[in-house]
């Protein structure tokens, strides 16, 4: 059995920590919030992020990063995309070189437009694995069948991570296309936010089906331009993740969009969700990136205007519908 440290004690990080603890691993969780740490250690709960959950006794929480990661064989980065670099800087020279870093964050770094595995690589000289795919913490803790993907430049490390997480209800595939896996997981949050806005505006299944299908095209278009393989975008980390995030009541991106579509101010909607809405950051980052490299992403264009230029969401949908006529396949 292994020693695994989770950085971040949010809902999905906690769900995965419980999965690994129940497999017999020694698991630690780092969280800056002393109340979360005490809730885990004393009450064996984490009510701030996921209620009615029993945390196993072989999980220990810390508010000290160095103690939480001491002698860890695996470190799971279960934190928002914008905090990845700062955490990795803190880990530098404090962890073993053979420790495998597993990122479950989805997004790209603002201002640099770098995929998160590249951000980690710039700060740490460790094997890096990305775990991604269609999954919500609420279903993982109920042991409902879930299937994800691990990817890495080091496929031996990916295979280790696959073995670490694999259970009878949690199936993990490997995929060598790291670019495709990361881009699919990041861009689908943009489309999910837009899907929520459609729901908030009262549009129907026809409209959402069109949005998701054309959203898949945007994922494929930007992903291919960045070096990803098209078949990856139609797999678990692209289409699979898009479906679950656009349709599930567990999806915080969809829920934020629902509030915005219902008339709530963007910042108030994010505040009401109470957790990071990665689609907002991803929309800004990918809007800037596609402008630089010349990739067409009309849904991202409209969502950017809604989020950052106060465009009326309904007029944004009309603008999409009135775009120049063209063939579906291009």
From Swiss-Prot:
Q: State the EC number(s).
A: 1.1.1.94
Xref: Pfam families: NAD_Gly3P_dh_C, NAD_Gly3P_dh_N
PROSITE patterns attached to this UniProt entry: NAD_G3PDH
Q: In which pathway does it act?
A: Membrane lipid metabolism; glycerophospholipid metabolism
Q: What UniProt keywords are attached to this protein's entry?
A: Cytoplasm, Lipid biosynthesis, Lipid metabolism, NAD, NADP, Nucleotide-binding, Oxidoreductase, Phospholipid biosynthesis, Phospholipid metabolism
GO CC terms, sorted:
cytosol
What this protein is reported to do is described as: Catalyzes the reduction of the glycolytic intermediate dihydroxyacetone phosphate (DHAP) to sn-glycerol 3-phosphate (G3P), the key precursor for phospholipid synthesis.
| Protein name stated in the entry | Glycerol-3-phosphate dehydrogenase [NAD(P)+]
Primary gene name: gpsA
